[in-house]
């Protein structure tokens, strides 16, 4: 069995959720948001719109199919929304250490560690989602070893400029011009 480290999610209203790490172990902060998207976790984690946010998927079990190979078609990734994880962290209910899929190359935990993104499991995400639904998105922080970081509000920064491409990128040279 792996050596699992405890950590906690602290919301700006003082609510504390205890969990266990399965990703990178670093105290971070951001806006805590839940998502109900019908996409996989690789797509959600690499979605640039989640920059600065701590994601809470409403689906209870995450990690069961691992992380796919980084495959491209016509210069566009087949399984990711961008070239890296953009969210600050991910909070889930149940983490599957055993993953299985014909296209997986590594575990979600391994990928999070490589990308230096914390992940916590064992948190009641239903209760957390209900709280966020009733009170709106809240600032939060993940604390390891009682090391606290200031709350960070990504809405105060120009996140679009941070995640946008710096130059024009053309995909394909087809007959039609799509704008």
Describe the function of each predicted region.
Residues 1-179:
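RNA-binding accessory domains that recognize and position tRNA/RNA substrates
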């Amino acid at each position: 069995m792996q050596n699992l480290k405890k950590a906690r999610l602290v919301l700006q209203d003082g609510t504390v959720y205890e969990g266990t790490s399965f990703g990178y172990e670093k105290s971070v902060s951001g806006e805590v948001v839940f998502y109900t998207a019908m996409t996989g976790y690789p797509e959600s984690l690499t979605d640039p719109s989640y920059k600065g946010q701590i994601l809470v998927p409403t689906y209870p079990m995450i990690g069961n199919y691992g992380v796919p190979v980084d495959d491209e078609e016509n210069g566009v990734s087949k399984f990711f929304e961008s070239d890296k994880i953009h969210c600050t962290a991910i909070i889930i209910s149940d983490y599957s250490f055993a993953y299985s899929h014909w296209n997986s190359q590594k575990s979600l935990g391994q990928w999070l560690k490589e990308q230096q993104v914390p992940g916590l499991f064992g948190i009641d995400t239903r209760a957390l989602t209900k709280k966020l639904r009733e009170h709106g998105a809240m600032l939060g922080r993940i604390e390891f070893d009682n090391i606290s970081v200031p709350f960070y509000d990504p809405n105060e920064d120009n996140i679009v400029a941070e995640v946008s491409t710096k130059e024009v990128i053309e995909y394909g040279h087809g007959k039609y011009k799509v704008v």
